[in-house]
Design a protein with these regions (language model features):
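Residue-level recognition of the GNAT/N-acetyltransferase active site
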Residues: 49, 53, 82
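Conserved active-site alpha-helix within GNAT-family acetyltransferase domains
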Residues: 71, 83-105
Length: 111
């Protein structure tokens, strides 16, 4: 069972991280705690406005989520991504775990 966006937004486990520049939101990350994965974190959305892509906002949000995972003593962060984003998430410390119906299932594990 995967958390849907609607379930996550209505959940007390929802995590929303925002990146702003000059008061405007330029990127956001939405994640949730998945009770079926021992409370690991699941990234549901990571979006950066096109004009701000390639400037490190996504990486900053992922780093903040990793810090939060460590603080909350979570073992892992999971994300499903498309093939064209594999190298991006690999650079962020995620590894390819399996193919899924939503792309490639990737995981970052706390050390």
């Amino acid at each position: 069972h995967k958390a849907t966006l609607e379930e996550a937004l209505g959940s007390k486990e929802a995590i929303t991280l925002l990146a702003e520049q000059a008061g405007d939101m330029v990127a956001y990350l939405l994640a949730t705690e998945d009770q079926h994965l021992k409370g690991d974190l699941i990234v549901l959305r990571l979006a950066v406005r096109p004009a701000f892509q390639g400037q490190g906002y996504g990486s900053i949000l992922i780093a903040a989520l990793k810090d939060l995972a460590v603080q909350k003593e979570k073992k892992a962060i999971w994300i499903d991504c498309s093939e064209d984003l594999l190298s991006y998430f690999a650079q962020q410390g995620f590894r390819d775990e399996a193919e899924s119906d939503r792309g490639v299932h990737m995981v970052w594990e706390r050390k």
